[in-house]
Amino acid sequence: MSFIDPYQHIVVEHQYSHVFTVTVRKATNVTKGAIGDMLDTPDPYVELFIPSAPDCRKRTKHFNNDVNPVWNETFEFILDPNQDNVLEVTLMDANYVMDETLGMATFPISSLKLGEKKEVQLTFNNVTEMTLELSLEVCSSTDLRFSMALCDEEKKFRQQRKDNIMQSMKSFLGEENSKNLTTSRDVPVIAVLGSGGGFRAMVGFAGVMKALYESGVLDCATYIAGLSGSTWYMSTLYSHPDFPEKGPKEINQELMNSVSHNPLLLLTPQKVKRYIEALWNKKSSGQPVTFTDIFGMLIGETLIHNRMDTTLSDMKEKVSEAQCALPLFTCLHVKPDVSELMFADWVEFSPYEIGMAKYGTFMSPDLFGSKFFMGTVVKKYSENPLHFLMGVWGSAFSILFNRVLGVSNSQNKGPTMEEELENIRLKHLVSNDSSDSEDESQHPKGTENSEANEEYQNSSQESWVQRMLMALVGDSALFNTREGRAGKVHNFMLGLNLNSCYPLSPLADLLTQESVEEDELDAAVADPDEFERIYEPLDVKSKKIHIVDSGLTFNLPYPLILRPQRGVDLIISFDFSARPSDSSPPFKEILLAEKWAKMNKLPFPKIDPNVFDREGLKECYVFKPKDTSSEKDCPTIIHFVLANINFRKYKAPGLPRESKEEKDFADFDIFDDPNTPFSTFNFQYPNEAFKRLHDLMEFNTLNNLDVIKQAMMESIEYRKENPSRCSVSLSSVEARRFFNKNNLNNHT
C-alpha cells in the first residue's frame, strides 16, 4: 500500500503448536491368539489415540484376512508442546458386530526431538511387530491471522473504494460544494449503520437503502454495517445475483412478496423433513447443532429461498472492484451464566474475514465453524451457508421462538414480547452444558466396521428424526430452553495462550483523546451491571462457544465501525429499535453504544439526551465532537430514528399529500398502534404494512439529504486538515495490553 499502517507493527502474541506426523507402515504376524487364529483370520486395522490432542483419534483402513498388512498411511496431529503428549497405538480386528482389541502399546512423544524423523518398532503380545515412522515439527504457519491491522484485502478495497467514491461524491455534492475534494486522500470514510428490530428493521432498512442508492449517497459510503434484522436485508441485497446492476427498488419488490406469507407455511411436513436431514448431516459430521440452525433455515427460506447454498465468501464478487460498500455483520460471543449486558465479545463478519478484534484473531469465512487448535485447523468443514449466519445474527428471535410463532398460551397474561426480549439482556442466556466435553476421546473402540457403522447410523438417524419431530411440537430442550436455541460453533481460539488481550483502540494512549470522567462511565443506561465484565478474556479451554444476536447487549453495530483502523469520519445511523411509544425518547441504544465506546477508549461524540426535551421528536439528530482540535479522531453521527412526522403530510420531500387515500396511507403509528403491525416479533408483513414502513424510511432519508450533504462537506474539510487519522510515529508503537494474567484483577 502507499501508506504505512502502524497497527501492523503491533505484535499479537501467540504460541506455535507442534505437528506430530505418524506413518503406519506395516505389521507382521498379526494374531488373535492360538485359539482365535484357528477360528478366524484377523482383519487388522490400527487406531491412533493422543488424549491431549483436539482431533485425538485416527485409524487406518482394515484388510480382510491378512496377517501381514501393509498400510503406508500417514496421519497428522496438532499438539500443545506444553502438554504431556503420549501416543497410544491399538491393533484392532474388524468384526461385523463388535471389533476386537488385539493389543495396545504407547510411545512418549516428548522423547522425539524437533525436526527428527524416527522409525519405531512396536511389539504386541510378544509376537506381532508393527513399524511406525514418527516426526515432530514446529507448526510455523497458522490458519488464524494474528494482527490488530485490517487484512490486506480490506486495505486494497479501501484504496480502490476511495478512488471510486471521489467521482461519486463530486456528483452528489455538486461542483461548488466539492471544490475542496482534490485528491482521493481528501475522501472521508463514511459508514451506514442499521440496527436490529426483526422484520421491522429489515423493511425499514430496505426503504433506507433505496433512498441512499437512488440519491447517490450509497456510492459515497465505504462501509455498511448491520445487526440482527438489518443484516437480513443486507444478506438479501448482497446475495442477489443482479445487485448492484439491479437496485433496491426491484429487489425490495421481491422482498415484499417474500414476507407477505405466513411463516408457519415453512413448517410443512415436506420442508420439516428437509430441515431435519440437513441438521442430521451437520450433527453427524461432528458440528454442534442448536435451534439457531433451524431458525436460519426458516429465515433463509423466507428471504433467499432460491439461493440457499450461497455463502458469505460469495459476496466477495460484489466488492471485487470496490463497486459496492463493504458489508459488515456482527454477533456476540457470550459466556455461560453471565448476562450479555455484563460480558460479550463482538464478532465481526465481512466477505474477507471473520474474527474478534479484542483478541486480534481473524480467519477466512470458509473456516468459521471448523475445529481449531492453537490457531490451526484440525478438522475443516464446508463453509456454513449464509442462512446459518442469518440465523446467528438474528438469534434473539430463535431464543423466543414460541413467541415468534404465536404458539404460547393465549391466556397467559405475562410480559409482552418486547418486554421479554428486553429481559433477556438482564439474564444470562446460556449455562455450562455437558455437551462441551464431548470429544472423540469418548467414542468407544470397535465401532469402525463400515457395515455395522452404517446400520448404527441408520438407526441413530431414525431415532434422532423422531426426537426432532417431537421437538417441533414442543417436547425437547432443543426448542424449549433458551440455551438450546442459542447458536454454537467450535471454539476457534481453543488452546491459544491468552496472556494478553488488546484494546479496540490499541494506540489510544498515544493519540489525543477526550478525557473521560469516571462517574460518566459509572452512569447506568439500561442496567447497573452493564458492561461490568467486558475486559475479561474468552475461555480458551472451552471446546465450543455460544454466539448470539448482538442486539442482546445493545442494538446498534457501532463496535464494527469504531475500530480506529477503519478511520470512519461520518456515521449515518438508522435505529429501528422498539420504544414504549411513538413519543418516547429514541436514544437508549446510542447511549449504550456511547458508554461502550468510552469504556474501550474509542472516540465518540457526546450524546445529549436532553436534545429531545429541547427539540422534540425529529427524523434525525446530528451529534458532533465539541472540539475537533482535541477530538480529531471523533466521528460525526447522523442518527435517524423511527418516527412518522413529515411523512404524514408529504408523499415526497416538498410534495404535499392531496387525496384522502394518500393521507390515510400515511396516517399510522409505529409503536402506539394497538394491532402492533410493526412488532419486533411480526414475521408477516401484508403489502400495505410493508409499503408504509418502507416508504416512511425512504422519505425520512430523502427529506434529510441536506443534513447528509452538510456533514459530508464538513468531513471533507476535516480530512483535508487531518490527512492521517493515526498521527503516531512507528518508533513509539508497542503492544498495548488490555490485561494480562498478572494484573487482570486491576481491570475488573
Swiss-Prot record:
Residues that, per the record, bind Ca(2+) 1: 40-41, 43, 65
GO molecular function: calcium ion binding; calcium-dependent phospholipase A2 activity; calcium-dependent phospholipid binding; calcium-independent phospholipase A2 activity; ceramide 1-phosphate binding; lysophospholipase activity; O-acyltransferase activity; phosphatidylinositol-3-phosphate binding
Assigned keywords, A-Z: Calcium, Cytoplasm, Cytoplasmic vesicle, Hydrolase, Lipid degradation, Lipid metabolism, Metal-binding, Phosphoprotein
InterPro entries per UniProt: Acyl_Trfase/lysoPLipase (IPR016035), C2_cPLA2 (IPR041847), C2_dom (IPR000008), C2_domain_sf (IPR035892), LysoPLipase_cat_dom (IPR002642)
Main location: cytoplasm
UniProt cross-references to PROSITE patterns, sorted A to Z: C2, PLA2C
Record-listed Phosphoserine modification sites: 505
SUPFAM superfamilies: C2 domain (Calcium/lipid-binding domain, CaLB), FabD/lysophospholipase-like
Residues annotated as binding Ca(2+) 2: 40, 43, 93-95
Biological process, per Gene Ontology: arachidonate metabolic process; arachidonate secretion; cellular response to antibiotic; establishment of localization in cell; glycerophospholipid catabolic process; leukotriene biosynthetic process; monoacylglycerol biosynthetic process; phosphatidylcholine acyl-chain remodeling
Compositional bias per record (Polar residues), positions renumbered to this chain: 449-459
Region (Disordered): 431-459
Control of this protein's activity: Stimulated by agonists such as ATP, EGF, thrombin and bradykinin as well as by cytosolic Ca(2+).
Region described as Phospholipid binding: 1-178
EC number: 3.1.1.4, 3.1.1.5
Any single Gene Ontology cellular-component annotation: nuclear envelope
Keyword Hydrolase tagged: yes
UniProt-listed PANTHER family: CYTOSOLIC PHOSPHOLIPASE A2
Function statement: Selectively hydrolyzes arachidonyl phospholipids in the sn-2 position releasing arachidonic acid. Together with its lysophospholipid activity, it is implicated in the initiation of the inflammatory response.
Domain notes: The N-terminal C2 domain associates with lipid membranes upon calcium binding. It modulates enzyme activity by presenting the active site to its substrate in response to elevations of cytosolic Ca(2+).
Name by which UniProt lists this protein: Cytosolic phospholipase A2
Native organism: Gallus gallus
Gene: PLA2G4A
